[in-house]
């Protein structure tokens, strides 16, 4: 959520910055609501002041033995007026809040202009895509030929966009998770967390999935209590960013506690409501997939440097797996709702002859922290400040598996196990048909 000053002090400039990322702010409506808010605020303050003065006069009248009934009647009338004004004020504040919750973050000045992914800017490429001397198969064919990916069973058990893994392919999927967690905890200073996969709506509001992206989530129906009333349900997490970041909700940290680095491996659940017909083949876009998430909570002045660091931690995994990739900075029109600046890492997939996203690393600045009231107090200061929150995939496990199956495939259909994964797979060097 944006600082309210952006909607009060220079709304035209705010509207222009939002327009650059494709969001049209209704300036007239916001301005009208702000005028109502200010008018009602003055009115409630004046009525409160009058009621306080009348209450004091009642005490003085009673002390003198005078008839205080007229004053009592006046206080009652003032109380009714004050209640009505406060009710009006609450309605206006709720309307402003509803608008504020739908406004995306302001892009950082370093973010390039642009409308969509075609305008993203490549920062670097790493590694050289391998040249194969045989016809390259995609990960679906590689995995099925190894008897390690079973898409038909996934459909039978659950439906479209679900997959069953087995044998050494399933083991490699697990090995990737363990390797990623060990790297981030042992080398990069993250604390591993085990978090709930079901979260409440307050958590989803905190990290800005709600209210805008309710249709992208899977929601559970609440249980019916003994009185026959249905309780509030939970939602399945779309990413571990939600529970990890919400660990800071309503907290005030000491400056010395920062930075806080958290990581977790979780399944992620997404409806893919806006992806009909896209990536229907294989593991690229699933309703359920695993991811190792990275989250950092930092001081405001450190957040941009931290974005570089966090992105580097995700790049480290790709480099140690020797998977060619490129790093791009997202343009204003392609950034996520809550992001001030985002880097995407895209891994090379030879069967598609292109790079595909495998990690997205974002600096959310104080956008999430304001919703969550996640704060810290500087040494010697009385008033706490909002944290800056950052998150990124380190990495998406299924897509990493896809990249290995394609980049490490051999002419006989087997797949070489990357060296860094071999200790996690009992020393296995090659996966053959099972």
UniProtKB/Swiss-Prot annotation:
One of its GO terms (biological process) is seryl-tRNA aminoacylation. Transmembrane segments: none annotated. The keyword Nucleotide-binding applies. Its EC number is 6.1.1.11. Keywords: Aminoacyl-tRNA synthetase, ATP-binding, Cytoplasm, Ligase, Nucleotide-binding, Protein biosynthesis. It catalyses: tRNA(Ser) + L-serine + ATP = L-seryl-tRNA(Ser) + AMP + diphosphate + H(+); tRNA(Sec) + L-serine + ATP = L-seryl-tRNA(Sec) + AMP + diphosphate + H(+). One of its GO terms (cellular component) is cytoplasm. It is found in: Cytoplasm. ATP binds at residues 270-272, 357-360. L-serine binds at residues 239-241, 293, 393. Consists of two distinct domains, a catalytic core and a N-terminal extension that is involved in tRNA binding. Homodimer. The tRNA molecule binds across the dimer. This is Serine--tRNA ligase.
């Amino acid at each position: 959520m944006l600082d309210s000053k952006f909607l009060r002090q220079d709304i035209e400039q705010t509207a222009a910055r939002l327009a650059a990322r494709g969001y049209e702010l209704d300036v007239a409506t916001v301005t009208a609501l702000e005028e109502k808010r200010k008018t009602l605020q003055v009115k409630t303050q004046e009525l409160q002041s009058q009621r306080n003065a009348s209450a004091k006069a009642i005490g003085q009248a009673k002390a003198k033995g005078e008839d205080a009934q007229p004053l009592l009647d006046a206080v009652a009338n003032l109380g009714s007026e004050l209640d009505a004004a406060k009710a009006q004020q609450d309605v206006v504040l709720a309307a402003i809040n509803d608008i504020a919750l739908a406004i995306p973050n302001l892009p950082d000045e370093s973010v390039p202009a642009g409308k969509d992914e075609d305008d993203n800017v490549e920062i670097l490429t790493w590694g050289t895509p391998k040249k194969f001397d045989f016809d390259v198969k995609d990960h679906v064919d590689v995995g099925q030929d190894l008897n390690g990916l079973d898409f038909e069973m996934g459909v039978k058990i659950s439906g479209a966009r679900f997959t069953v893994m087995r044998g050494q392919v399933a083991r490699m999927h697990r090995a990737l998770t363990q390797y990623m967690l060990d790297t981030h905890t042992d080398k990069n200073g993250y604390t591993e967390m085990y978090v709930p996969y079901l979260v409440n709506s307050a958590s989803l509001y905190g990290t800005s999935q709600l209210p805008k992206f309710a249709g992208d989530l899977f929601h559970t129906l609440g249980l019916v209590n003994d009185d026959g009333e249905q309780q509030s349900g939970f939602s399945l997490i779309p990413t571990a960013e939600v529970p990890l970041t919400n660990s800071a909700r309503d907290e005030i940290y000491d400056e010395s506690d920062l930075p806080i680095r958290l990581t977790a491996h979780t399944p992620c659940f997404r409806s893919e409501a806006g992806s009909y017909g896209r990536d229907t083949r294989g593991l690229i876009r699933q309703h359920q997939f695993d991811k190792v998430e990275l989250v950092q909570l930092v001081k405001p002045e450190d957040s941009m440097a931290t974005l570089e660091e966090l992105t580097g931690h995700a790049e480290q995994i790709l480099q140690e797996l020797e998977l060619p990739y490129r790093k791009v900075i997202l343009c204003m029109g392609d950034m996520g709702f809550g992001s001030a600046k985002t880097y995407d890492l895209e891994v090379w997939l030879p069967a598609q002859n292109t790079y595909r996203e495998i990690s997205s690393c974002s600096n959310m600045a104080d956008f999430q922290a304001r919703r969550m009231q996640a704060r810290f107090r500087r040494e010697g200061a009385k008033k706490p400040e909002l944290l800056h929150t950052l998150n990124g995939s380190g990495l998406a496990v299924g897509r990493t598996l896809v990249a290995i199956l394609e980049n490490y495939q051999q002419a006989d259909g087997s797949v070489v196990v990357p060296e860094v994964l071999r200790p996690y797979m009992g020393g296995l060097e090659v996966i053959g048909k099972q």
